[in-house]
Amino acid sequence: MSCSDKVRLAHEFFRRVWSPPHDLDAIDELMTEDYRITTAGKVISGRRDFKAWVAAMQKTCVGATNEHLDVFANAAGNMIVSRFRTRGINNGMFGLPADGAPVSFTGIAIWRVENGRLAECWVERSAFELYNQLCRS
């Protein structure tokens, strides 16, 4: 799998999972069985638990769409980095009232690729800024 194929893998993940119609079954195709994501200091392990986490996130950020602002693979071709923007409608993010306000936040995801699938991810989001945005709305 070339570096450009790995970049396409990240694009496909965002397009199929994080954009409507939010195809959670695509996770089985795009991720390894033991996929791990570290986000907000928490580790989610396995595709089943990852699907549940994505579904919960999509319930609090209705109609979520993600777009890559930048995406590239490292020289070795085993890592992909994406700077992204997520947009949606607040439906109770951070346990705050579901006020229907539009939300937008940025983040960085670093994926490890194994045998043509996403195997591990580390995500940092602009959660503090998003929280403040929601508290002001």
Show the residue positions of the predicted features.
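C-terminal and inter-domain tail/linker signature
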Residues: 1-137
